[in-house]
């Protein structure tokens, strides 16, 4: 029944790993096959967006019961590339889910720039899809 001051997580981003990685094929000897963590339907990394967000909230809601009052929950995430008809702002979707947890308040974000990554214009010269060099560090505090 120990309580914690901080919960820190970098969850899988829904079914992102299950998608073909055409832009990464040169790094992987022309292998663009999906690289799922597991085959389990219970794995967050195998879930469609809405199911992923709901299950992530349920997991973090359960974890929040072990968080001390005034304790912090920090979630690292990266947005998906925009698709036709979808903005794919995962960080905003995660914020909207976590604030549904009783007592959890959104306190802001920090941007982490991954300096180990190189900027690469995927799709050039036919289209321009910039890879992302940053992640969002979302900060929440248990107030109630």
Go through each PLM region and give its residues.
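Class I S-adenosyl-L-methionine-dependent methyltransferase catalytic core
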Residues: 1-144
């Amino acid at each position: 029944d120990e309580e914690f001051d901080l919960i820190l997580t970098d969850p899988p981003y829904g079914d992102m790993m299950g998608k073909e990685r055409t832009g990464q094929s040169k790094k992987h000897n022309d292998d663009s096959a999906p690289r799922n963590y597991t085959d389990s339907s219970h794995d967050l990394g195998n879930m469609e967006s809405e199911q992923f967000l709901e299950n992530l909230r349920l997991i973090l809601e359960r974890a929040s019961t072990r968080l001390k009052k005034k304790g912090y929950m920090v979630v690292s995430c990266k947005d998906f590339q925009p698709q036709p008809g979808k903005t794919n702002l995962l960080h905003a979707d995660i914020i909207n889910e976590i604030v549904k947890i009783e007592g959890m308040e959104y306190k802001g974000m920090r941007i982490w720039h991954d300096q180990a990554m190189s900027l690469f214009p995927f799709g050039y010269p036919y289209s321009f899809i910039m890879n992302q060099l940053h992640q969002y560090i979302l900060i929440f505090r248990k107030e109630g």
